[in-house]
Amino acid sequence: MKLTKKSIALGCCLALILCFCAAPLFAEAEPKVGQVLGPVKFAKPLTDEDAKYLGLPKAQEFTIQDVKSPYILIEQFNNMCPHCMHQAPGLNELFNLVQQDPALKDKLKFMSVGQNNDEMQVKAWKVIQKVPFAVIPDPTASLGKALNFSPYPVTMLVDKSGKILWDVGIIFF
């Protein structure tokens, strides 16, 4: 059986189409409203100031339930992600607006979690992006594993139980 260039090209095209059609079957599902985070143990906040902001007695490992606020806005980022870099100023502005509102200030805490980022990387992120709220290293991607979702940035509002109340998902600019 002699294969022609035309049949080889057609076979390659069909193989590519099958690959692209199969990819969504293996894709991770974005976090959904109502989903509850598993038992995530976060690394210690960068500074004692960040720990104090979250209501922790000191900079130590913690869970969502340890945060002294009924609601937490969590951003999952990576310091090399251009979309995360683009999103950072908007989150900083939102944080400042919440801090100026006496009704919200103590009811909503902000937390950025650096997926696959160590302490040095998130320190640089906090300085370069001028992040005024708590930044947490997550070198083992524990939040992404709890969500079963690794892309970033993801921004979500959770309650004390870890239930997702609102999810922006992935923001593409």
For each predicted feature, which ranges?
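Short active-site neighborhood of thiol/selenol oxidoreductases, capturing the structured segment around
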Residues: 55-85, 91
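N-terminal "domain-start" segment that seeds a small globular fold
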Residues: 26-63
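Short, internal strand/loop/helix patches
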Residues: 111, 123-160
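Bacterial N-terminal signal peptides that target proteins for export
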Residues: 2-12
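Bacterial N-terminal signal peptides
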Residues: 11-21
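Non-catalytic, surface beta->alpha helical segment in thiol-disulfide oxidoreductase systems
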Residues: 160-173
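Structural microenvironment flanking redox-active thiols in thiol-disulfide oxidoreductases
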Residues: 85-129, 142-144
